[in-house]
Every structure is written in structure tokens, then in C-alpha cells.
From Swiss-Prot:
This is Glutamate--tRNA ligase 2. SUPFAM superfamilies: An anticodon-binding domain of class I aminoacyl-tRNA synthetases, Nucleotidylyl transferase. It is an enzyme of class 6 (ligase). The keyword Transcription does not apply. One of its GO terms (biological process) is glutamyl-tRNA aminoacylation. It catalyses: tRNA(Glu) + L-glutamate + ATP = L-glutamyl-tRNA(Glu) + AMP + diphosphate. The lineage of its organism: Bacteria, Pseudomonadati, Pseudomonadota, Alphaproteobacteria, Hyphomicrobiales. Catalyzes the attachment of glutamate to tRNA(Glu) in a two-step reaction: glutamate is first activated by ATP to form Glu-AMP and then transferred to the acceptor end of tRNA(Glu). GO terms for cellular component: cytoplasm.
Length: 456
């Protein structure tokens, strides 16, 4: 059975880029009757917070992603410690004592000599006495994994290719001689992402690892750890990264692109899902009504090789398609949270929904209709015309036909037509050049408010 995982770090709220990875894994599992695991990468106990764990779960529920299993790496430290000890005993995990500053200086020297900035394994030359002396000075080791890029002498590094058939990008190759031995354990004893991830993927029988292409080099190193632990390799797939329009990478600092903020702004879940999945693929970005329809247009092989750019204007446009199809019953609860309620609420929604991009935008039109303010938005020359319009406003209760009757009478009386006739009335009554049909707005505004706004 196919088994995939989504492994966010609960050190912040997930953004649209994380969402794309989650959806690719979720849809791949759905397409293949597989299992989807949510695994919190919470080994950083200081920065990981329960509020972010709760937030990630809320976001996934909103995206209609339902994990089959949920795991926390913070509950598996004893397992990681056991594997780490085994690797240390085999000489595959070795202690290093350089400070960040020392490593930085060494890197600059290598670059100045036009050498690749790869760690030279000098720590392997330390004797027991050297290590005792360094530790007596207060230094604590970080631990590196010894990459198998040599025959017998670890200081005689040779070209060593690690290749895999990437299920998204095709054959990928990494030369282990071009990368440093990865640090797996920090000076304080905490684990970096690499080792716990491999151990969990083995223990949880993950069959397919689908993640961003920024992990390609990391995959080459991780494959050697899988092999060192005599584990079966999963299939790897690396999808193009989602960036901003300017090409900047997304991060948890892009709070305006977090799923939490997009949800609170009133975007529809399916709009976010459609754009996340279809951006950067050969498929057209379209509004698919539900996840089943989206799944029919999902394929890892459709992913392009270039970066996918996320444009908020695309999301707004896509979102409007969903909003225009929403019935009053579907949005009633959300409208009530915006204080939009009462006997005219349904008529109001049906009137304005085709002219808004997000459900939250309804609050603006509710305010326009119910506010006591007047809109001083017409020219001085139009004020006489507005006074004439008051005199010709149809008697009795206003309905859908009142606008046509009113403007016909005004046209005959003033010889105005087209924009000169309609725009002055729209500006005076709504303060805006564009919006819902005026014939639908008149019954919502009511006679008294109309007269007040026309009498400047």
C-alpha cells in the first residue's frame, strides 16, 4: 500500500507553499487508495508550540485533508538516540568541535582558493586526548554523518554518484564528493531534521516521499543514511517550489500568505486548493467545484520544471468564481458573523454576490446600504439633476421595476442617457462607480435613505 507523509514544523503557521506539499501528498494518497500521515517535526522543543500544532490541524481540516495517522517526533527521542548510538559505534557518526565562526573562516579560505566549500573532516584526526582537552575548555561536539564517498581513506574523497528515479523529475544524480558530511546532532544534543526524518520514514513504512525541490541535495545524503540502516528506499518525488510573483521564496514570515490569514480574509477553501495544486503545472487554473473534480486534474507528471509563482490576484479571481455560486444557505452562518442578518439578508446576498470577490466583502455593501452617511461623490453640475431625480422617484414601495420606471422618467425629463444618466445616481446612492444592479439595490436602500442621499 502507498503511504505518504506531510511533516510540518510547528514553529509557525503553514503558508500556501506548505499547503501545496500537503495537497500533493494527500491527493496522491487519494488517487492510489493510500495512507496519509501527518507527522509533526517538533524536535525543536523551544520553538515548537501547541498553538501552531492546533493551527496546523485547523488549517488541514479547512482544506479537507484528513490524516489517517498523526505522529509527533518529540515523542520518539529514545528511538532516535538508539539509532544514533548504533551509528556512533559503527564510526558513521563522528564528533566535531569547530565553532560556527571557525567553520565560516574555513569556508572563506576554501572559496578564496577556488575550492568547493566542503567540510574537510579534520575532526576525524582528533585523538581522545584532543577531544578531552576541547571538552575541558567547554566545547561540546556536534555530530556529522560520514558520507560513503571514499574507498578506505576518508580523506581521499572521490566522485561518488547517488542516483534515483524521481517520480516527478526523472533521473536525479548527486555527487557525494560535492557536499559536506551532514550535521545530524547539534551541540546541545538536539536533532536536526535529517536523521529523525529517515528513522520515521523507515519505522512508519513510508513508500513515497513527495516534497519541494529544495530537498534534492538533502535526498542524496538521506539515501546514504537509509542504506547505512539497511532499509528499503522509498520513492522520491520533488515538485517545483512556490514563490511570490517577484520570485522570493515563501516562509512563515509571509504571514499574509498563511492559510490562517487567507481563511480569515474570506477566501474559499476550494479556491486555495485549486490554485495550490494547479499553479506550476501543465493544467489550466480553473475553479473545480470539489476535491473529487480537482483530483481528476491532478498528476505529479504535470508538474513543470520551473518555479511556480503564486499571485494573490489569481487567487482573488479564482475565488470570485466560487463566491458567485454560493447560495444563501451555504453562507448564512458566515454572514451572521459579519452581522448580516434579518429578513432582507437573503435578498441582499443574492443581490451583491456577483459583485464581490470574497464573502467578507459583503460587509462593505451591507455598510453602504445601512449607513446614514451621504456620498459627496457627484460633481456640482449634477446636483440639479439629483434634485430632479428626487421629484421623479416612483411613489409607493420600491421594487425591482422601480429603477427602470425612474430612469425612464428621468431620461424623458432631462434628455440624459447612458452614463450621464446612471452614473450620477449610482455615485450619489452608493459612493461607488461599480456594483450590483441598481434595480436590486433600491428596495434595500428604501425611499427615505434614497431621498436623503440625493438631497445634498
Amino acid at each position: 500500500m502507498i503511504k505518504v507523509r506531510f511533516a510540518p514544523s510547528p514553529t509557525g503557521y503553514i503558508h500556501i507553499g506548505n499547503t501545496r506539499i500537503a495537497l500533493f501528498n494527500w491527493l496522491y494518497a487519494q488517487a492510489n487508495n493510500g495512507t496519509f500521515i501527518l507527522r509533526y517535526d517538533d524536535t525543536d522543543l523551544e520553538r515548537s508550540k501547541q498553538e501552531y500544532i492546533d493551527g496546523i490541524m485547523t488549517d488541514l481540516e479547512w482544506l479537507d485533508i484528513k490524516p489517517d495517522e498523526i505522529h509527533h517526533q518529540s515523542k520518539r527521542f529514545s528511538r532516535y538516540d538508539k539509532v544514533a548510538e548504533t551509528l556512533k559505534e559503527r564510526g558513521l557518526l563522528y564528533p566535531c568541535y569547530e565553532t560556527v565562526e571557525e567553520l565560516g573562516r574555513h569556508r572563506k579560505i576554501q572559496l578564496s582558493r577556488k575550492l568547493p566549500p566542503v567540510y574537510d573532516r579534520r575532526a576525524l584526526k582528533l585523538t581522545k586526548e584532543d577531544k578531552r582537552l576541547l571538552e575541558s575548555q567547554g566545547r561540546k561536539p556536534h555530530w556529522r554523518f560520514l558520507l560513503p564517498n571514499f574507498e578506505s581513506n576518508p580523506f581521499q574523497i572521490k566522485r561518488t554518484e547517488i542516483s534515483w528515479d524521481d517520480i516527478v523529475k526523472g533521473k536525479q544524480t548527486i555527487d557525494l564528493a560535492s557536499i559536506s558530511d551532514p550535521v545530524l546532532i547539534r551541540e546541545d544534543g538536539s536533532y536536526l531534521y535529517t536523521l529523525p526524518s529517515v528513522i520515521d520514514d523507515i519505522d512508519m513504512a513510508i513508500t513515497h516521499i513527495i516534497r519541494g525541490e529544495d530537498h534534492i541535495t538533502n535526498t542524496g545524503a538521506q539515501i546514504t543514511i537509509f542504506e547505512a540502516l539497511n532499509a528499503k528506499l522509498p520513492a522520491f518525488g520533488h515538485i517545483n517550489l512556490l514563490t511570490t510573483v517577484s520570485g522570493q521564496g515563501l516562509s512563515k514570515r509571509n504571514s499574509d500568505l498563511s492559510i490562517c490569514s487567507l481563511r480569515e480574509e474570506g477566501f474559499e477553501s476550494m479556491a486555495v486548493r485549486c490554485l495550490s495544486v494547479l499553479t506550476g503545472t501543465s493544467k489550466n487554473i480553473e475553479a473545480h467545484r470539489d476535491q473529487k473534480a480537482l483530483l481528476e486534474h491532478f498528476s505529479l507528471q504535470n508538474t513543470s520544471k520551473s518555479a511556480a509563482k503564486f499571485d494573490i490576484t489569481d487567487l482573488i479571481s479564482l475565488n470570485s468564481h466560487f463566491v458567485h455560486e454560493l447560495t444563501y444557505e451555504e453562507v448564512k452562518t458566515r454572514l451572521e458573523k459579519l452581522s448580516i442578518c434579518g429578513e432582507k439578508a437573503e435578498y441582499f446576498w443574492n443581490t451583491i454576490r456577483d459583485n464581490i470577490d470574497k464573502v467578507n466583502d459583503a460587509a462593505l455593501w451591507w455598510e453602504i446600504i445601512h449607513s446614514d452617511q451621504s456620498f459627496d461623490a457627484v460633481s456640482f453640475e449634477d446636483r440639479a439633476f439629483l434634485q430632479q431625480s428626487v421629484d421623479l422617484l416612483p411613489e409607493g414601495s420600491l421594487n425591482d421595476e422601480s429603477w427602470k420606471i425612474w430612469t425612464t422618467a428621468l431620461k424623458e425629463k432631462t434628455d440624459r442617457k447612458g452614463k450621464a444618466l446612471f452614473m450620477s445616481l449610482r455615485l450619489a446612492l452608493t459612493g461607488r462607480q461599480h456594483g450590483p444592479e441598481m434595480g436590486k439595490l433600491l428596495p434595500l436602500l428604501g425611499r427615505e435613505k434614497i431621498i436623503n442621499r440625493l438631497t445634498i
